[in-house]
């Protein structure tokens, strides 16, 4: 029968410690990288355009980071509501519906009068239904016409479609 000597145990322990240190180092490096700024030091309009460029090429992880950074840095800018909407879209596109719902809700609460307000509310409703919150989601979807009577016709039609698709009960006026 074989036996394990003290030297073998010590060598094995040293190898495990080295591996542990290397793993920890890698994790720290990755966390640090994710905190790096994405947007260029330009005007908010150029930053928004830059963030949008990631959507156009299908890099939704970078688009998420760029739009989040834009909203954090330019929360009072006229494009902030649009940026918040696109931030939410990066999650929806990747089927991360809980994150999408959270981001749409934040957009609806912070930027209700933005150009993207009506579609933001619609997508919030759809995302809520997709995560199992049908009653809440339907409430958002059926409330769009009341909340945004001047919304684009395409948004109102899409809301009607989603209302039927999810078999939402009509909101009583």
Predicted regions and their residues:
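Acidic, proline-/serine-/threonine-rich low-complexity intrinsically disordered segments
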Residues: 1-50
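Short solvent-exposed coil/turn linkers within tandem alpha-helical repeat scaffolds
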Residues: 73-79, 110-116, 146-157
